[in-house]
Regions:
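Class I SAM-dependent methyltransferase Rossmann-like catalytic core
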Residues: 1-19
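Conserved SAM-binding loop
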Residues: 16-129
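S-adenosyl-L-methionine-dependent methyltransferase catalytic module, highlighting the catalytic core
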Residues: 3-5, 74-78, 98-225
Length: 225
C-alpha cells in the first residue's frame, strides 16, 4: 500500500487526474450529492433514506443515464453479479458504518468493480453526533445517517490500494459546512484500479505516476496522534 500526502488543492487535482472516466458507475450511499468527477453512460445511485431519495428523483427526473435505487448497501450490492460495474464510489460512506460492516462493504465493492473503486473518508475517527431533532448538514432530517461510527487509516487497506491524503483546515463544499469539521483534519482518498490488482500489482505500482502535483507534497502527518 502506497501513501502520498498533498495540500488540499493539489489533492483534488491529483484525484481528478487519476480517476478513470468509465461507462458504468455505482455510487453507494450518495445522499443528495452523487459523485461529480465525470458523467458516466450509466450512473447507478444507491441511497436508503427516503428524503434524500426524493431529492435525487426530482433532480434527475430527465436524466436517462441515472438509475436510482432505494436500498441499503447490503441488499443492493449482494443482488449484483461479480464485476457488474466499471467503478464504485464510496464518498463519505464507510465512516458512517461500524468497522466490521464497512470492511464487508469494501469487500463487496472489490467483487463488483471491473476497473476502479474510489473511497473518500476522514483519516481516523472523527466524532460527528447530532442532538435529537437537529437537522443534518443539508438542513434535512437524515441525522441518523450522518453519525460517524468508525475511523479509517491507510493501514486498513492492502497493497492493491493507492492512498493519497491532504491536511485540511475545516471543510466547506459548495455551501455545505458540517459543524464537525471545526479544526485541522486529514482527508483521504483511496483509489484501487481493479483491472490490474490481482495479476500485476508490482508492475502496476512501478508504473503509477509519482503524483507530484503543482504545489508539491506536504509532510506526512502522524495519523495516530
Amino acid at each position: 500500500m502506497s501513501v502520498e500526502w498533498f495540500d488540499r488543492e493539489s489533492l483534488d487535482r491529483t484525484i481528478q487526474d487519476r480517476i478513470q472516466k468509465t461507462d458504468v458507475v455505482l455510487d453507494v450511499g450518495c445522499g443528495i450529492r452523487p459523485q461529480a468527477f465525470f458523467v458516466p453512460k450509466l450512473h447507478v445511485l444507491c441511497e436508503p433514506y427516503a428524503e434524500y431519495l426524493r431529492i435525487l428523483q426530482n433532480r434527475y427526473a430527465q436524466r436517462s443515464n441515472v438509475l436510482i435505487l432505494q436500498s441499503r448497501w447490503m441488499e443492493a450490492l449482494r443482488a449484483l453479479p461479480d464485476r457488474a460495474v466499471d467503478s464504485v464510489f464510496l464518498v463519505d460512506v464507510i465512516e458512517h458504518l461500524e468497522k466490521e460492516e464497512g470492511t464487508r462493504l469494501v469487500a463487496e465493492c472489490e467483487r463488483l468493480a471491473r476497473k476502479q473503486i474510489l473511497i473518500f473518508t476522514p483519516l481516523g475517527f472523527m466524532p460527528q453526533d447530532y442532538a435529537s431533532g437537529e437537522r443534518d448538514g443539508w438542513g434535512l432530517t437524515g441525522i441518523e445517517w450522518q453519525v460517524h461510527k468508525s475511523g479509517w487509516t491507510p493501514d486498513d487497506f492492502d497493497a492493491s490500494w493507492r492512498i493519497v491524503g491532504a491536511l485540511c483546515r475545516a471543510m466547506a463544499d459548495d455551501g455545505l459546512v458540517d459543524h464537525a469539521y471545526d479544526r485541522n483534519r486529514t482527508l483521504v482518498y483511496g483509489l484501487a484500479n481493479r483491472a490490474q490488482i490481482r495479476t500485476r500489482v508490482i508492475e502496476y505500482y512501478l508504473r503509477w505516476p509519482t503524483g507530484q502535483a503543482k504545489g508539491g507534497q506536504v509532510d506526512r502527518p502522524d495519523y495516530f496522534s
